[in-house]
Amino acid sequence: KRGLRSRKPIGFRQWVVHHFCDRYRVIAPDTRGHGKSPRGTSPFTIRQFSCDLYDFMKNHRIPKAVILGFSDGANIAMRFAMKHPDMVTALILNGGNLDAKGVKRSTQLPIEIGYKIAKHFAKRSAEANKNAELLGLMVNDPNIEPEELAQITAPTLVICGTKDMIREDHTRKIAENIPNARLAIIEGDHFVANKRSEEFNREVDRFLESL
């Protein structure tokens, strides 16, 4: 069984990947432009990252996998599971969102301001262009309609924190619109996988054991 991690690596490998690697075959690829993965020339979007995951699994002869995604990784996982349901054994979505409105305004507003500033200087600065691409993911993506989630056929665990940057009603909407989904809310913020690793891993273990 294999997992997909988010584009935010801090703590995730240490607290989640390490926990599962003794019982499962865990693969944690970096999305394009992150870690050791080249940026390439394709669009820097959640849809493209989903296509990249498809290519990655095909190239590594992985016919089917349990996919775990955090934040943008959860958004990639949703897109992937909708388009390639036959390649998903189960889905674990931690801190994902359907659109920018799912993010609490207190968090989203600084992101939007930063995006506008970075975009303004993008043509004159490689660093600003990189920041514009990163922030653009949180401003312009993933744009998933709730009804589209019905295309996800795999058993799904949706996880969030009680003080998550994603609105709780938005997370509940995700769980309610995926046919075979269960919801787990853990005390903590957006980074419960790191800060509340025991509770997080316990929920994931319970879910995987039920498959």
Kindly give the residue locations of the regions a language model identified:
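Conserved HGGG/HGGXW glycine-rich cap/lid loop of the alpha/beta-hydrolase fold
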Residues: 1-36
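Short beta-strand/loop motif that positions the catalytic acidic residue
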Residues: 152, 158-160
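Catalytic histidine neighborhood in serine/cysteine hydrolases
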Residues: 175-191
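Conserved acidic catalytic loop of the alpha/beta-hydrolase fold
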Residues: 47-65
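Flexible "cap/lid" loop of the alpha/beta hydrolase fold
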Residues: 75-83, 89-118
